[in-house]
């Protein structure tokens, strides 16, 4: 029987998810693991869209005083009755998600942080009337939530100490130390770096965290999440009992993302098991610690769409959820060896890289190697094994693109980059269009070889020959459309006894051009492939549609490609 529970597309509030009868993949073992391997401050680094916010919301719902304990009925953690008795609903919890902090200026972003902290503090309005708080304490609380001219009015000094002050006031009221949860701690740093106020934001975040996490005697423990582990020296200076759980750590490795068993169970629950292979190829492949996990955002979105249309094909939900500028920046900075490495990745192969897990944002683009590290930590690449470095005790990682979806991300960014490169190369494009009109096969091949020498191949080397031919067809079509805006270009146009690959109608009303594209498995076969193309044009009478338009001065080209080389043969018909 098909599950009738709603799928939680975009739902990252644990309480809402449980109260509103959404499907939930049980990750409550995370609570047990955190308590059993306790650390005063724990940072989880995972790629975006891997359930970080939902897990942090779940922690809040479990520990917070006054929680609805029935939210956890039937879940893993409810089986540990001793732990639930000791910890469930026993602590004040301060919860911040910084994922929405951004701004074109530091003042704008700083106010967003003020707003988030003040609104979180407003959840504890009972502090205003608390008998345990002194008048001075109440004044400090009121200062955190104070409003002036419709805007929250915390000054810089209070902002720095606000989380520490709030935990102190909660301790005074409840007699229990506070748990502090900060979700997506590094988003403000990312936005600051992009908008030119990185140093100011680092100073602010370091100050807030220093007061809340380092010198805070009213802290029970803290949990943070983010995509990157910003170097300890930059943000987490002086934190001694500080633990980072990254994608390379085996502990907690199944708590962010869906395991294979969880995906199989989800598909069974919705009678979707026949789609397992597609979902695995597109959304699996991430290796965290010793676990193989799927991106939960993709799985939930795709199964939800399958419920409406069982014939829908997998697509790139991850790419649509936020920007993929990091891949584009790598491509833009790539030298010839980096382009070669990207081509190996696109072809499904591995590359070997030494990885740094603790970078500052201003270091990310300082070297290509740093960019590879960030692509790994943010989920664009995943680990496929280790390689011991020669004359060293250190190991490098074998890196691979995890799945079809991320491969599509790379391909799209490469295509966008290549379009911009071609669009800015007017000289080569003009020479190409002139050579085509002049029937200069040598210059046609020369200009195409120049262009292909600059490109990053997105050709799947394992694909059948007809798919490779389609790739070169699309490449040439795109170049021709950018070479002369006055040409009318048709692709796969019915003509004679078939469909011509490319048909061009130049400004001259008497002229016409027919092109047939072929793929050659190696350079030695280019001549033969061109001859086959020319024979096909004549046999299928691909020039007929042009002649029907009154165009009688027709040039036919057979153009063959092999990797990044090509040859052109032309003939007037």
Task: Label each PLM-derived region with a short phrase.
Residues 1-80:
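Walker A/P-loop-proximal flanking segment of P-loop NTPase domains
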Residues 181, 187, 197-238:
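Sensor-1/coupling segment of RecA-like P-loop NTPase cores
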Residues 242-243, 294-541, 566-573:
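Extended alpha-helical interface modules used as scaffolds for assembling large macromolecular complexes
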């Amino acid at each position: 029987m098909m599950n009738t529970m709603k799928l939680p597309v975009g739902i990252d509030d644990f309480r809402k998810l449980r109260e509103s009868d959404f499907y939930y993949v049980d990750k409550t073992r995370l609570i047990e693991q955190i308590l059993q391997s306790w650390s005063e401050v724990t940072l989880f680094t995972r790629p975006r869209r891997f359930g970080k916010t939902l897990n942090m919301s779940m922690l809040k719902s479990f520990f917070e005083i006054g929680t609805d304990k029935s939210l956890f009925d039937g879940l893993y953690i409810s089986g540990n009755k001793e732990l639930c008795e000791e910890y469930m609903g026993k602590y004040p919890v301060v919860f911040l998600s910084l994922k929405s902090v951004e701004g074109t200026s530091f003042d704008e972003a700083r106010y967003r942080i003020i707003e988030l902290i003040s609104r979180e503090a407003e959840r504890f309005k009972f502090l205003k009337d608390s008998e345990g708080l002194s008048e001075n304490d109440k004044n400090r609380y009121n200062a955190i939530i104070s409003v002036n001219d419709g805007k929250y009015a915390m000054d810089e000094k209070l902002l720095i100490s606000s989380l520490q002050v709030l935990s102190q006031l909660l301790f005074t009221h409840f007699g229990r130390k506070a748990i502090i949860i900060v979700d997506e701690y590094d988003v403000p740093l990312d936005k600051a770096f992009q908008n030119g106020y990185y140093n100011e934001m680092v100073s602010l975040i370091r100050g807030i965290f220093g007061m809340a996490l380092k010198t805070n005697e009213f802290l029970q423990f803290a949990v943070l999440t983010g995509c990157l582990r910003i170097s300890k020296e930059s943000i987490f200076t002086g934190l001694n009992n500080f633990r980072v759980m990254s994608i390379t750590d085996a502990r907690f490795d199944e708590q962010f993302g869906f395991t294979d068993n969880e995906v199989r169970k989800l598909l069974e629950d919705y009678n979707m098991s026949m789609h397992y292979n597609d979902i695995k190829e597109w959304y699996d492949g991430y290796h965290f610690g010793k676990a193989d996990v799927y991106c939960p955002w993709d799985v939930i979105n795709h199964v939800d769409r399958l419920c409406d249309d069982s014939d829908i094909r997998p697509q790139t939900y991850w790419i649509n959820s936020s920007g993929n500028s990091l891949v584009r920046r790598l491509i833009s900075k790539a030298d010839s060896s980096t382009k070669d490495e990207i081509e190996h990745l696109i072809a499904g192969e591995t590359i070997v890289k030494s990885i740094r897990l603790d970078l500052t944002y201003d270091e990310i683009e300082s070297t290509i190697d740093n960019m590879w590290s960030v692509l790994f930590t943010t989920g664009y690449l995943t680990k496929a094994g280790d390689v011991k470095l020669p004359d060293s005790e250190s190991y490098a990682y074998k890196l691979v693109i995890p799945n079809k979806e991320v491969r599509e991300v790379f391909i799209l960014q490469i295509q966008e980059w290549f379009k911009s490169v071609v669009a800015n190369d007017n000289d080569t494009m003009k020479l190409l269009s002139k050579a085509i009109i002049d029937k200069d096969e040598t210059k046609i091949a020369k200009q195409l070889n120049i262009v292909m020498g600059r490109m990053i191949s997105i050709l799947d080397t394992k694909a059948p020959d007809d798919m490779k031919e389609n790739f070169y067809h699309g490449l040439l079509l795109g170049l021709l459309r950018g070479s002369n805006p006055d040409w009318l270009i048709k692709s796969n146009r019915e003509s004679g006894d078939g469909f011509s690959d490319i048909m061009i109608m130049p400004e001259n009303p008497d002229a016409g051009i027919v092109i047939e594209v072929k793929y050659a498995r190696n350079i030695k076969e280019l001549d033969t492939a061109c001859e086959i193309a020319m024979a096909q044009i004549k046999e299928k009478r691909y020039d007929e549609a042009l002649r029907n338009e009154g165009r009688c001065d027709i040039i036919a080209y057979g153009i063959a490609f092999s990797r990044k080389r090509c040859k052109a043969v032309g003939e007037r018909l």
